Design a protein with these regions (language model features):
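Conserved glycine-rich cofactor-binding loop
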Residues: 9-10
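Conserved glycine-rich Rossmann-like NAD(P)H-binding loop of the short-chain dehydrogenase/reductase
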Residues: 23-40
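Rossmann-fold cofactor-recognition segment
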Residues: 44-60
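Conserved mid-core segment of classical short-chain dehydrogenase/reductases
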Residues: 86-101, 144
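Active-site helix of classical SDR
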Residues: 115, 151
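Residue(s) in the substrate-gating loop at a strand-loop-helix junction
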Residues: 135
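C-terminal helical subdomain
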Residues: 175, 191-226
Length: 253
């Protein structure tokens, strides 16, 4: 199996890299932190690994990485757009406008730019799976997390569009919506996180969903039910229930 993975230097991305390496997969790992990529590659030796330091907001860097991976290893079986950021924001604060842009550029545009270098080759080969990591946070708008919630809702809708667009091509599209995972990103959350999953457990569940080519998968199962209930809440009741919800700190403050 050949797997290309972004956001591979920590959290779910690192756990997925470890999972697939243990299965004997050939890996292409893309992330911003070069030292962390080197650490992971060393830890996973002697697995076949190519590392690509870069930012998913940089389309040219992803295009180069994709071309190199295909040239060295062939068309990937799985491409996982996992890179993402979460920042607390307030619309009334001008200083947060660049934060909104960074979140969307990473979580939405970065996903598109991750897939683009591989789509034509995968369609030509009539095989492969494109995997986008969205979030339960995209089911409803969370106060103070307007950028993150909106970006994950956009990612979910984009993935649905892509799935239908590629129907019949042999290329599957899998949408992954995690709840709370114990990662450096969630470690900053100053509020209760129900059904918190360890990254290794999350990676096993995600990999199983990918293997089964699940169109849409929420983990853990408890959050799937929470998500369904959230979607059913009438707007007045949702507003009342969440107006005092804990908020992610604003890093621009």
């Amino acid at each position: 199996m050949k797997v290309f993975l972004t956001g591979a230097s920590s959290g779910i991305g690192e756990a997925l890299a470890r999972h697939y390496a243990a299965q004997g997969a050939t890996l292409g790992l893309f992330a911003r932190r070069e030292a962390e990529l080197a650490r992971i590659a060393s830890a996973l030796a002697p697995a076949s690994i190519a590392t690509y330091p870069g930012d998913v907001r940089d389309a040219a860097a992803l295009a180069r990485a994709g071309a190199d991976f295909i040239a060295r290893f062939g068309v990937p079986d799985v491409v996982v757009a996992n890179a993402g950021i979460s920042r607390g924001v307030l619309t009334g604060e001008a200083i947060d406008l660049p934060v909104f842009k960074d979140v969307f550029d990473t979580n939405v545009q970065g996903m598109v730019q991750t897939f683009q270098p591989f789509v034509a080759a995968m369609v030509e080969a009539r095989r492969g799976t494109l995997v986008g990591v969205a979030s339960v946070a995209g089911f409803r708008g969370l106060p103070g997390s307007g950028a993150y919630s909106a970006s994950k809702a956009a990612a979910t809708t984009y993935l649905e569009s892509l799935r239908v667009e590629l129907a019949g091509s042999g290329v599957a599209v899998v949408t992954i919506c995690p709840g709370f995972i114990a990662t450096p990103m969630t470690a900053r959350n100053p509020y209760w996180m129900p059904f918190l999953l360890a990254p290794d457990k999350a990676a096993r569940l995600v990999a199983r969903a990918i293997d089964r080519r699940r169109r849409f998968y929420v983990l853990p199962w408890q959050m799937a039910w929470v998500g369904r209930l959230l979607k059913l809440l009438p707007r007045p009741l949702y507003d009342f229930a969440f107006r005092r919800a804990g908020r992610k700190p604003r890093q621009s403050a």
